[in-house]
UniProtKB/Swiss-Prot annotation:
Source organism of the structure: Emericella nidulans (strain FGSC A4 / ATCC 38163 / CBS 112.46 / NRRL 194 / M139) (Aspergillus nidulans)
Signal sequence bounds: none
Family: Belongs to the HEATR1/UTP10 family.
Transmembrane segments: 102-122, 136-156, 939-959, 995-1015
GO molecular function annotation: snoRNA binding
Quaternary organization: Component of the ribosomal small subunit (SSU) processome.
Entry-linked PROSITE patterns: HEAT_REPEAT
Name of the protein: U3 small nucleolar RNA-associated protein 10
């Protein structure tokens, strides 16, 4: 044993209390997010839950997803959940719920409800300790806010490694800075990983929010960039390895992020990371492709713009501009990808992406099924998004693709590619780049030209080389392009019978043109082609087949090379001699079309052909027109020109312009326009008017009769430049074409597009352009094409017609606009469902309608309503019916619907036509408003939309008029009553607001017309508009108040009316609306109203009306306080004086202004007394909570001019309040409220002024007033005591007044109030002058106070004395004798049977608590004895007494009173404590325990004798109670008391050393075993108590006191031989013995029980208790108590010999006694030692199992001895025994690792 038992005991004590460290628990409980540590520490979980649950409920209203947590972490059950008591699985489940909630609440942490809800997680579940990482990450996006600083303050010191960066900021109590977080992310990859995992988890839960994702995106982007920068190295392989590590860390995050497409901010953040990776790391091409595919696969409409930037940056890093197929297809699917790329190209490089798109567009040209790719390609070059170098690369891609296609592409694809290549050479910006590409590349242009059947213009080419190359190409292509077979097939065709221009679909033409395209590049092939019989070349001069074929080719949608070849063929034909007598004017329209072709090569061919025709014409004299009757078919009649006219046209209008046309495709249009308009009269070259007319009609007739649309489109393009010529117009001449086009069906139009490849929309626009705005009936003509409507009309044509009308509308004179508008309106109001209605309406909305049109429309509304008026019910029925619409038939309803639609459309047109520009509409808008009101009453409909439109138009006109010096319209037409009706009768907020704004505007322009009907407006505002919280409604209210109220007040003043009563309805409207006005707008709104009305005149009225209507509603009181806070002191006091006048007026028999403002005396008014009480309570609140006190003090200190007025107003208010109080003494509510006002009024005074005032009031005879005044003083002292010297001195002087009241007043309540004031003064100022308070204490302790019969004054006096003791300390000693005697007498009185006074009882114990703390030495032994006896009586009382005060007093006694005095008193009164019962005994033992704990060791040693005496008496309690006939303790009480005694004894032992304690222990052993043998029951009781103590003794002090067991071995053996669990008298002792032994064995570290002398004595008696297992019940007891004890003994024995001895005894119980024991052993072991009973054998087997489990192989060393027993037991007759032995065998096999079968056989 150690030399210093005390030191070792102290160490054990320290270790044993760690788990019960109450201080640490209180500290943990005080960790709060929103409360101060001190406040938080005082809160219980019920209080916390109520606060936090309110926040949680608000969250549920914000987001329904929070509701799921109401059943778990916010349930009532959660208040008692302690995670320290949960197992691992339960904690894991709880963590998942907590993290789900934190994730969801993260987005709302700046809202107060969210912080409250999280507070519950912190206080109840301590998430900041158990879920630290997740909690910090939830708050981290708000790292710069105060709430994050609050979190830092409560976090544990040891933060997760990923978040160590926060530790310095936690220590310094400052917010972290962003740069620190970024730097840590760079250097600490754990932070990046942790943050990524958190963000992904939150997003999967769909709890993401902007703050989190914005924070995450910024941190991870900067972090990854910094990581990549910091990993740069001079060694490339090292740097690459580091970069690869970073990429591998980030890619899984990107993969998970891209998968959540709907979380747009997360996806955009991933795009940002991709950009960083692309720019900072050298990514492999496959990685770039993978990232691009991931980006395009993840984008949505919302993220597409950001994704496109990301793809552009990634593509920029690729060495080759080749896009993955998925990326290219995704780009194609985008809406207008080039526009989006153009938008981002200003900030990001897009060249590689664009080049990738080019490469994708020209990839696999032969397999492309549509034109989308080539259209995109064409747009790319036109958009010029690439610089010259990149444009050159793009051109190279196209040219390489074009040179590689051969003859495998379709004609359409060939044409589109040819157009693109031609654009390269035609475009002024692209041509230089194209030229450079050709010069620098090895691309064979001839191959491209051949493949595309075009000629690339403006590129100088050596003709000889070109011819040779073309020949070579021809030779090489001969075998592969199919030309020969096609030509051979066509050679078999017979001659075509008519012109190739007669029809769209001619099968043989399609074959011919394909073959001609193949031959166009070879003169030999062309020569062979023209000789085909089907072309009838031999009859070309007389029949149209030959030339018509080539005309159709060069005017169709074919490659330029093919067109040029056709023109060349024509040119060569017509220049031959055979054509010298032929008039070929039929070719002129087509040649003009060719001159306008975009291809210079085609234009050149046309120029050459026309030049040849011009040469032929010169030689002609008179000849017939070629193909005159057969060009378009037999039925076509063209007004052909005469040969001379044709010659003039050529010579004057065409041939001179040819060379210009060769270089400029637009020139022919200008030339033709000039020619047809006519030149100067003196010009020899001018074309005369008749010829112009003939030429114009000639061209127009071709445009009309030409069956083909491609050449017709070209001709129209030229003709639409000319409005009129030679007295006719193009509209007139081309009208047949317009009608033809109109009559075509959708299918026919589709065929045109399919066969001729023209744009239908462009052609349709050209056709409709034939109608010019200069045409007189142009709009009527256009309308005639769609009216009457036919279902066969194409919708696109109808839409185009109305678009054309819209285009020419502004160029048409106003009179025609008016006429057209009427027709359009008729169309728009038709009942049919034709598209004409919608198109007409849309047109009317788009065009600018003149004022007369709008006026005409408006005039139709009243007339229409009058017409339909007859549909309504009869007048009588209208007055009585609740639903007038019932009277209408279905037909009537249809008419009504039509009328509503018509009116809506008219008003929409007016509203959309800038009505402010048409003030002439004002009268008819008001007429319309009147008609709508009338109609509304008839059909029982609100018609809000119509009213809104009408009012909106009027408002626009009025607002424009307000800006001018005088109204722009006749104000006599204004109908303010109608506008007010709109305000009152509609439910539409839009209508209400617009009407209010209109009233406000009219009140400026014409106030005399508005103000007489303004009051209903404010009534309406109160019930409707004031409730709104949108910015528009706020603006409406502001304008209404600003503009209407001043005008109203001015009007009342002019009429010499009282302005307050005159505006009562207005005030009532606003006050009635208070509860509906959004809270944050109330103060601003009422402040604006009062300011406009006049604060001094109206503030009191508004306050009174609010108080009358809402009484003490907190929100109203706050508003009232805010309203008075802006007024100065004089205005505020004046307002209160008027307010009190109004209260007085309300209490008169004949009220005045209060009847108007408050409804006093009216039928529906409230009782005057209730109104007065409410008003006074509100006024009291204002006095207490306004800033009046500060205002008065400031004004009086500075002695301003208002000082005297303030004093006068204050005096007047005081007199008013006192007068109301005196006159209303019989009306308690009003009298009390007046007292509250008085209290509030006094609160505005300084302390000295206040005391002077109440001292004067105390001299009044009215006791009620005096009590009220003292109550005010007590309240003031409690709330805000003054600390200046003068105030303190004046307050102490006032004690004499109060003492005098206590001594002399017969009024108990007044005395009570005086004592309360004495108490408060003592508490606040007593230490300044203790002597003055001492005299007061003596009075309070005298018969005048606590000596009275009234319990109220007694209780208050005793509590006052307690306060005096705390404040005065020793100065209280003179009063103590009387205080002690009277207080103990009162305590005894409070405990009288059937007269228990709990409050008095508590007050006395409170007094003694103060005495024990401050004057413990002044409480004598006799007083202490008396107090203890009374406290025992209190504890034993059955009455409902509060134990807390009594127990607190006893605790203070134990801690503060001298230990000797206290213990002596307890020892003297121990018997009374026991007699009083368990509660008293418990409390006195608590006192002893606290005394030992709080006093030093020396005090314990000094009082050891008396302490031991008390403990021995306490230990003997069980014996006394068991032998007593009237026991007050039941078994549970005894066990609880003994547990407490054991705890006290252990605490005493901690204060002793071995020398002091060992004698006490020996004495205790003697005491326990020293009773005479005949006192069996007493001996059993003492041993039970003693062994229960020893169990705690060995369990607490452990190995230090194991040696003390030597004193008890003999006693224990004796008990083991006699005690039995089946004997009720010894069962308790048996249980105590087993548990004590187990505790002693368990903590043996000094080999005490290994000693044979010790173990031999105890082992056999202990093991023999297995014999008591004879039934299921006793077997269970033995299993839970005896077997563990035997096991612990075996563990402590720890030697083979000892184990063998134990096993020998144990195995006897595995067999029946006859089989297991010899006669000698049986004799030695005693009777019944064996396993006769199966339950005994089972118990022995369970013991073996326990020993095997705890000792393992050490125990199984005895297996050879056990095997015979095991074999026998496996064949035991009892199934239970057999089952247990098999379990043991399995256990043995598990330990040994081998089976026992061989050993058992």
């Amino acid at each position: 044993m150690a030399s210093s038992l005390a030191a070792q005991l102290s160490q054990i004590a320290a270790n044993s209390t760690n788990q019960l460290n109450l201080k640490a628990q209180r500290l943990a409980h005080s960790k709060s997010l929103i409360f101060d540590k001190r406040v938080a520490g005082s809160q219980d979980f019920d209080t916390i839950y109520d606060i936090c649950y309110d926040g949680f409920r608000e969250l549920c209203q914000l987001d329904f997803r929070f509701a799921q947590f109401e059943r778990s972490i916010f349930s009532e059950q959660s208040k008692v959940q302690d995670r320290t008591e949960m197992n691992v699985e339960q904690n894991r489940e709880l963590d998942s719920v907590l993290e789900a909630f934190l994730a969801l609440v993260g987005g709302r942490l700046l809202l107060s409800p969210a912080v409250k809800a999280v507070e519950w997680l912190i206080r109840r579940f301590r998430v900041h300790e158990y879920n630290t990482r997740f909690t910090i990450l939830t708050f981290l996006p708000y790292y710069s806010t105060p709430v994050f600083l609050n979190l830092l303050a409560i976090l544990p010191d040891d933060l997760p490694s990923a978040l160590k960066v926060l530790i310095p900021y936690k220590r310094s109590a400052i917010n972290p800075v962003r740069q620190a977080l970024v730097q840590n992310a760079i250097s600490n990859r754990d932070l990046i990983t942790t943050l990524n995992n958190y963000v992904l988890q939150v997003c999967r839960q769909r709890a993401h929010h902007h703050a989190l994702l914005a924070f995450w995106a910024g941190i991870i982007t900067e972090g990854v960039a910094g990581m990549l920068d910091s990993s740069r190295s001079g060694r490339r392989n090292v740097e690459k390895q580091k970069h690869d590590d970073i990429i591998l860390q980030i890619l899984p995050v990107l993969n998970d992020g891209f998968a959540m497409k709907d979380v747009s901010e997360l996806v955009i953040g991933c795009y940002m990371v991709c950009v960083v990776l692309a720019q900072k790391a050298e990514l492999q091409d496959r990685v770039l492709d993978g990232l691009m595919e991931a980006v395009t696969g993840s984008w949505t409409e919302e993220t597409m713009s950001s994704g496109l930037i990301c793809v552009a940056v990634l593509a920029q890093q690729k060495p080759d501009p080749i896009l993955p197929k998925r990326v290219f297809k995704a780009m194609l699917r985008m809406k207008d990808p080039l526009k989006q790329l153009a938008d981002i190209s200003t900030e990001y490089k897009t060249s590689q992406l664009l080049l990738g798109l080019v490469a994708g567009c020209v990839d696999s040209l032969s397999t492309q099924k549509d034109s989308a790719r080539l259209e995109l390609l064409s747009s790319m070059f036109k958009s010029q998004l690439l610089n010259d170098a990149d444009t050159a690369k793009a051109m190279t891609f196209v040219l390489q693709a074009a040179s590689a296609v051969g003859g495998t592409i379709s004609l359409d694809t060939q044409t589109q590619i040819a157009e693109i290549v031609q654009h390269f050479s035609r475009s002024s910006s692209l041509q230089p780049v194209f030229q450079k590409v050709i010069d620098e590349s090895s691309i064979d242009l001839s191959v491209i030209e051949y493949n595309l059947q075009t000629v690339i213009e403006s590129v100088p080419v050596n003709k000889a080389i070109e011819d040779v190359e073309m020949e070579d190409a021809d030779k090489t292509e001969t075998a592969t392009d199919g030309y020969d077979s096609a030509l051979e097939s066509l050679a078999k065709e017979s001659s075509f019978s008519t012109s190739f221009l007669t029809a769209q679909s001619i099968p043989v033409f399609d074959k011919l043109v394909q073959t001609f395209a193949l031959s166009a590049g070879s003169p030999e092939r062309v020569s062979a082609f023209v000789e085909l019989p089907v072309l009838c070349k031999a009859n070309a001069t007389t029949s149209p087949q030959f030339l018509s074929f080539f005309v159709r080719v060069f005017t169709g949608m074919y490659p330029a090379g093919v067109k040029a070849a056709a023109l060349k063929t024509i040119s060569s034909i017509v220049s031959s001699a055979a054509w010298s007598d032929v008039d070929v004017q039929a070719l002129l329209p087509f040649m003009l079309i060719a001159l306008a072709d975009p291809s210079e090569r085609v234009r050149s061919g046309a120029v050459d052909a026309l030049a040849n025709i011009g040469k032929v014409v010169d030689k002609k004299k008179k000849s017939g027109v070629w193909a005159r009757d057969s060009l378009y078919g037999k039925s076509m009649h063209i007004p052909w020109l005469s040969s001379s006219d044709f010659q003039k046209i050529l010579e004057r209008a065409v041939l001179p312009e040819l060379e210009e046309c060769r270089s400029d495709g637009e020139h022919i249009g200008r030339a033709l326009e000039n020619a047809l308009r006519g030149a100067a009269s003196d010009s020899a070259s001018a074309i005369k008017k008749p010829l112009r007319l003939a030429f114009f009609t000639y061209l127009c007739s071709h445009a009309v009769h030409l069956p083909l649309f491609a050449p017709r489109a070209g001709l129209l393009n030229l003709l639409n430049r000319v409005d009129k010529a030679g007295g006719t117009t193009r509209t007139k001449e081309l009208e047949p074409l317009l009608k033809k086009w109109r009559d075509m069906s959708e299918q026919e139009v589709a065929e045109v597009h399919e066969k001729e490849q023209i744009s239908v929309s462009d052609f349709e626009a050209q056709v409709l352009k034939t109608v010019t705005p200069k045409e007189k009936d142009s709009i009527n003509l256009l309308l005639s094409t769609v009216t009457p409507y036919s279902p066969s009309l194409r919708a696109s044509f109808v839409s185009s017609v109305f678009n054309r009308i819209s285009e020419i509308w502004g160029k048409v004179p106003e009179d025609r606009q008016i006429t057209a508008a009427e027709k359009l309106f008729e169309l728009s109001t038709q009942a049919s469902e034709s598209p004409l209605v919608d198109n007409a309406r849309d047109l009317l909305r788009r065009v600018e309608l003149p004022g007369p049109v709008l006026l005409n429309y408006l005039q139709q509304i009243p007339a229409s309503i009058t017409d339909i008026d007859s549909l309504g019910p009869a007048p009588k029925r209208r007055r009585t019916s609740q639903n007038n619409m019932v009277a209408m038939t279905t037909k009537d309803e249809a008419k009504l619907s039509k009328l509503m639609d018509k009116m809506t459309f008219i008003l929409e047109l007016v509203d959309g036509s800038s009505p402010e520009a048409h003030p002439e509409l004002t009268e008819w808008l008001f007429q319309t408003l009147a008609a709508l009101h009338h109609f509304k009453s008839q059909i029982q409909s609100g018609m809000s939309y119509l009213l809104s439109l009408t009012l909106g138009s009027l408002l626009a006109i009025v607002n424009r008029s307000r800006a001018s010096s005088k109204p722009q319209f006749d104000t006599s037409v204004v109908r303010a009553d109608l506008v007010v009706d709109c305000v009152r009768t509609t439910e539409s907020p839009q209508v209400q607001n617009t009407a209010l704004l209109l009233v406000a505007g009219l009140s400026v322009i014409a106030p005399e017309l508005v103000l007489h009907s303004v009051m209903p407006i404010f009534t309406f505002m109160g019930s409707s508009v004031l409730r709104k919280d949108d910015d528009y409604s706020v603006s409406v209210i502001d304008q209404t108040i600003d503009q209407v109220v001043p005008a109203l007040i001015q009007s009342l003043r002019h009429q010499k009316r009282d302005v307050v009563s005159g505006t009562s309805e207005l005030l009532l409207s606003f006050t009635a609306a208070f509860e509906h006005i959004p809270s944050h707008r109330r103060l601003r709104l009422f402040h604006a109203l009062i300011t406009k009305l006049g604060t001094e005149e109206f503030l009191f009225a508004v306050l009174a009306m609010l108080a009358n209507r809402y009484s003490m509603d907190k929100a109203v009181l706050v508003l009232m306080t805010g309203l008075v806070s802006d007024a100065d002191a004089t205005v505020e006091l004046s307002t209160y004086s008027k307010f009190l006048n109004l209260v007085g007026d309300s209490l008169k028999s004949k009220p005045g202004i209060s009847q108007v403002l408050l409804g006093i005396g009216s039928d529906d008014g409230r009782e005057p007394h209730k109104v007065a009480a409410d008003l006074l309570r509100a006024l009291a609140y204002l006095f207490k909570h306004s800033s009046l006190k500060v205002k008065i003090a400031r004004a009086l200190t500075t002695e301003t001019d208002d000082s005297e007025r303030i004093r006068a107003l204050f005096s007047n208010i005081l007199e008013q309040v006192l007068a109301i109080g005196e006159s209303m003494q019989s009306v308690k509510p009003v009298h009390q409220a007046a007292g509250d006002v008085l209290s509030g009024l006094f609160s505005t005074l300084t302390t000295i002024d206040f005391l002077d005032t109440i001292e004067a009031l105390l001299k009044r005879p009215d006791d009620a007033l005096r009590r009220k005044v003292l109550s005010l003083l007590a309240t003031r002292l409690q709330q805000s005591p003054e600390r200046d010297g003068a105030s303190q001195t004046r307050m102490l002087d006032f004690l004499t007044v109060l003492v005098d009241i206590v001594q002399s007043s017969p009024d108990i309540l007044l005395k009570h109030a005086a004592v309360t004031c004495i108490d408060r003064i003592t508490e606040k100022y007593g230490k300044k002058e203790p002597s003055m308070v001492t005299s007061a204490a003596q009075v309070v302790a005298s018969a005048s106070c606590i000596g009275q019969e009234d319990d109220r004054i007694r209780i208050n006096g005793v509590l006052c004395l307690a306060s005096m003791v705390e404040v005065l300390g020793q100065a209280m000693i003179p009063a103590l004798p009387e205080v002690l005697n009277r207080s103990l007498a009162l305590l005894e009185l409070s405990l009288e049977t059937n007269k228990v006074n709990a409050r008095l009882h508590d007050a006395v114990f409170t007094l003694f608590s103060a005495l024990f703390v401050h004057l413990p030495y002044m409480v004598s032994a006799s007083h202490l004895d008396r107090l203890l006896v009374l406290s025992f009586k209190s504890a034993a009382s059955d009455e409902d007494l509060d134990n807390e005060n009594r127990q607190e007093a006893l605790h203070f006694m134990a801690r503060k009173v001298d230990m000797a005095v206290a213990l002596a008193s307890i020892e003297r009164n121990w018997t009374q404590a026991v007699s009083a019962g368990p509660s008293a005994t418990h409390e006195v033992l608590d006192a002893i325990s606290l005394s030992i704990e709080k006093h030093p060791k020396s005090a314990t040693m000094k009082n050891l004798s008396v302490l031991t005496t008390i403990l021995f008496r306490a230990f003997d309690l069980r014996r006394e109670q068991t032998q007593s006939s009237e026991s007050a303790f039941d078994a549970s009480d005894l066990e609880e008391i003994e547990d407490l005694i054991n705890d006290v004894t252990i605490k005493m032992i901690y204060k002793l050393n071995d020398t002091a304690f060992r004698p006490i222990f020996i004495k205790l052993v003697e005491w326990a075993t020293g009773l005479p043998e005949k006192n069996t029951q007493g001996g059993l009781a003492r041993l039970t108590t003693f062994y229960r103590f020893l169990q705690v003794f060995f369990g607490t002090l452990q190995s230090i006191v194991t040696g003390y067991a030597s004193y008890i071995i003999e006693s224990v053996v004796s008990v083991l031989e006699t005690a039995s669990p089946s004997n009720p008298n010894t069962k308790s002792l048996w249980l105590a013995t087993m548990r004590m032994l187990r505790s002693a064995f368990e903590h043996d570290q000094d080999e005490f029980w290994q000693s044979p002398s010790h173990i031999t004595k105890i082992s056999t008696p202990l093991i023999s208790h297995l014999r008591h297992a004879t039934s299921t019940t006793t077997g269970a007891l033995v299993a839970t108590e005896t077997i563990p004890t035997i096991t612990e003994l075996a563990v402590a024995a720890d030697s083979t010999d000892n184990h063998k001895e134990l096993n020998t005894v144990l195995m006897r119980f595995l067999r029946p006694s006859s089989a297991s024991l010899s006669s000698s052993s049986t004799k030695r072991a005693g009777p019944g030692l064996g396993g006769d009973n199966p339950q005994t054998r089972i118990a022995a087997l369970k013991t073996e199992q326990a020993l095997t489990e705890h000792l393992g192989e050490d125990w199984l060393a005895l297996l050879p001895e056990m095997l015979p027993y095991i074999s026998e037991l496996m064949e035991d007759e009892d199934e239970g025994v057999e089952r247990e032995v098999r379990k043991w065998v399995k256990q043995i096999e598990g330990v040994l690792g081998e089976r026992l079968d061989d050993m058992l056989t």
